[in-house]
């Protein structure tokens, strides 16, 4: 038997939505499998579903508010808050009892995520192009309701019910620098040519 320690350590399964950092209308379902690496850092691999033939579509790092506030301003542009994803009920932990899920999200509500998708599966059935920066929703009226309804039916969950159950979760003040798109401008990756450095190690 081959040991697969990182895979075995992925103890958390989450489902939510991501939007492309430069286009709110492009929202996709994201299935996360996460490791709690340190007290202030989670790392997740992201698939398009929780199925045997699921496509690997990206990664996300999740950090504490304290760690986020310590980041350089330029780095903060890459991060999004999780407050609305938690409070709205959009982010869910399928199969976890409500009490345990509530406790988990009470901690997650103050965290920040940096997400890149490597497969634009909303457009192509192949991982073309370069990784794209993704963001999270931050308010009512932004989410693709058809996408949420389809997700809820498939997973047997109720976003509205989860929203009601999480009404008592306190939302901390959002740290400056996150969710840059809310100010009208954002950042995104792009492919460009550059000179190749032929310097060798020796």
Describe these PLM feature segments.
Residues 1-41, 111-202:
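N-terminal domain-onset segments
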């Amino acid at each position: 038997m081959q040991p697969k320690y990182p895979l075995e350590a992925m103890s958390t399964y989450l489902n939510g939505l991501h939007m492309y950092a430069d286009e709110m209308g492009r929202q996709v379902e994201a299935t996360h499998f996460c490791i709690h690496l340190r007290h202030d850092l989670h790392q997740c691999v992201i698939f398009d579903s929780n199925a045997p033939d699921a496509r690997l579509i990206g990664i996300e790092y999740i950090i504490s508010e304290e760690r986020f506030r310590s980041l350089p301003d330029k780095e903060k542009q890459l991060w999004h808050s999780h407050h609305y994803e938690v409070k709205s009920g959009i982010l869910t932990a399928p199969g976890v009892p409500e009490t345990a899920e509530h406790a988990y999200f009470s901690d997650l509500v103050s965290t920040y995520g940096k997400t890149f998708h490597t497969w634009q599966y909303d457009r192509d059935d192949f991982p073309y192009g370069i990784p794209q920066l993704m963001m999270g929703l931050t308010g009512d009226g932004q989410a693709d309701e058809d996408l949420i309804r389809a997700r809820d039916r498939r997973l047997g969950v109720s976003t509205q019910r989860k929203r009601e159950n999480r009404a008592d979760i306190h939302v901390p003040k959002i740290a400056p620098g996150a969710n840059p798109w809310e100010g009208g401008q954002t950042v995104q990756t792009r492919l460009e040519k550059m000179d190749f450095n032929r310097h060798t190690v020796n």
